[in-house]
Design a protein with these regions (language model features):
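Active-site loop->helix "elbow" adjoining a glycine-rich segment at hydrolase catalytic centers
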Residues: 2, 118, 150
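Formylglycine-dependent
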Residues: 2-80, 86-95, 104-107, 113
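Histidine-centered active-site microenvironments of extracellular/periplasmic hydrolases
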Residues: 5-14, 92-98, 131-179
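Short linear motifs at secondary-structure transitions and domain/linker junctions
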Residues: 36-39, 57-58, 119-122, 152-158
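A short beta-strand-to-alpha-helix junction
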Residues: 54-64, 110-124, 138, 161-179
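A long, amphipathic alpha-helix that forms part
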Residues: 65-73, 101-141
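Active-site acid/base region of carbohydrate-active enzymes
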Residues: 82-83, 137
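Structural cue for short, hydrophobic secondary-structure segments
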Residues: 83-85, 146-147
Length: 179
């Protein structure tokens, strides 16, 4: 959400390695979104890697974590800072079928199943990250912070534990996040 202004890009804000989607998010369909890669998708997304577009394979969250893990493995012998802001869960609500299937008997509607599937996919990837930190003997010397940027955009009845409001709201359901 920092736009496409060069001075706000991560490579101009202290990051040595940058692997991001373009302005507006992946898969969003509103005027002005995806100006750099029209019709980009959550599956096999085109990503900007250090200023160059690369076509990737897989679901976007998996792709971001795979690249982060590759980079971390190369840095493991020296201190590093890695920031992995996932695109999901974010509209449009799309998830791999195997993750949506986990919720078919628990909630109605494809979008709800995909929303929860996106979250489960993040959980899987965070678990993989923790496993790799253990494998590389980094877990005991690593601070892992897991947070979010806002409350749910999906509605407060089942997604915000009864808190009033959601994404974009000043109420607790829109602004209460860890840390």
């Amino acid at each position: 959400h920092l736009g496409e202004q060069d001075e706000y890009q991560p490579n101009n804000r202290g990051f040595d390695e940058v692997f991001i989607h373009g302005c507006g998010g992946i898969g969003q369909r509103f005027a002005g979104s995806q100006g750099d890669v029209p019709k980009n998708s959550y599956f096999d997304p085109t990503i900007r890697h250090n200023g160059k577009f690369v076509k990737t394979k897989g679901f976007c969250t998996d792709v971001f974590f795979q690249e982060a893990l590759r980079w971390m493995k190369n840095q493991k012998d020296k201190p590093f800072f890695a920031y992995i802001p996932t695109n999901a869960p974010h509209g449009p609500f799309i998830a791999p079928d195997s993750y949506k299937a986990l919720y078919k008997d628990h909630t109605k509607g494809d979008a709800n199943q995909a929303f929860f599937g996106m979250i489960s996919n993040i959980d899987t990837n965070v678990g993989l990250l923790m496993k790799k930190l253990e494998e590389w003997d980094l877990a005991d010397n690593t601070l892992l912070i897991y947070s979010t940027d806002n409350g749910s955009a999906k509605g407060s009845k089942i997604f915000n534990a009864g808190m009033k409001g959601g994404k974009g709201s000043l109420n607790e359901g829109g602004s209460r996040v860890p840390l």
